[in-house]
Amino acid sequence: MTDTTRLFVTIAALAMTLAVVLGAFGAHALKARITPAQLGVWHTAVQYHLVHALGLFVVAALCHVWPGEAGVRLAGWMMAAGIVLFSGSLYVLVVTGV
């Protein structure tokens, strides 16, 4: 396994774990404290977070198949950035009530 493959597997596993934790947090701790519309936004954030974390596992597999392919690595970093920017902004939106 290459270092890049190992890196993306690690990032994907951490992202997947965080998505599950945040999904459970929204379903149990936030449910009574936020509006149904905000809960829907939270669920959207979790759904995109999970899908992109799964995509990072695919990127890790592709990095293993094509170890020197810069485009695959770029796709992985863009997916990771998408989790932080898109899902992260939705999480912040719900928590801050903006």
What are these regions (language model features)?
Residues 1-98:
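Polytopic transmembrane helical bundles with strong interfacial aromatic enrichment
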